[in-house]
Amino acid sequence: MPGKRDLCMRFFCGLAAVVMVVAAAAGEPSAPDQVVAEAGWKYRVVTRNLPGIDNLVMALDGSLYATQELPNGAGKVIRLRRGGVTVVATGFSRPDGLLLRGKFLYITEEVPEGRVLEFDLQSKKQRVLATLHNPEGIDTLPDGDLVVSEDSINGRLLRVRRNGAKAVEVILGGLNRPEGLVAKPDGAVIFAETATGRVLSYKSGEVNVVVDDLDEPDQVEIAPDGSLWITEDTRDGRLLRLKDGALETVLSGLRSPQGMAFGSDGSVWLAERGRQRLLVIHGEDSR
């Protein structure tokens, strides 16, 4: 029969295990912060308690818009400014992709019959531009139309017109879970093909591999200096930068990092959904 000391040790070990399981189920870290900034980089936590935080866009006034990808009409778009959080729009089902153009926000709902929405920041009115299968990534093509990805096994890149025409045009099909994307001024579309671990480029009927051997690449963004930033949506995810043909890790140990945005001061803003928080990253050498 075990002694009192052994029984106490077993009790406290079991209690610790229960606490860890409950914390994991709640989406909170069960261990101290394990995010590692590589040499030359530093980060800090700006805002906490942002469940489902996903994609980000930076406004000209320095405020940040973000989607909170919550299901069944609980999803919302919020505005973060000087530490404050304001709800901009609600009633969405898993709002994911986010784009800001002038007074309009464009939002995608990542559900089987997900809407691509245009939301007027001034009038607060919205209209449905298209209904697609798991729409996620969104950006503007050089001619003003939208390009949207469908996050599915037989996924597509689609052209969605902003003029109210309901018809959509297939740009590229047969993809394996395309997610985040960015359109370049020359018409090329850079996108993450999550299931294959690749970032691809599509232009004029030609597909090229930009980066491969990644672990569930999720979002991609092009910084003002032309470098390509990538997040890996895993429990031990990374924030990556591709510059001048060299891929480097900026942060590791992230929990499901999602969207990025760039500040006018060279900062990088990052949604870390797994820890329900917003980070800001700076290069220590001001690069």
Residue ranges, per PLM feature:
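Bacterial N-terminal signal peptides
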Residues: 13-23
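Beta-rich, blade/repeat-based domains predominating
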Residues: 49-61, 74-75, 91-109, 113-115, ...
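Beta-propeller domains
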Residues: 68-78
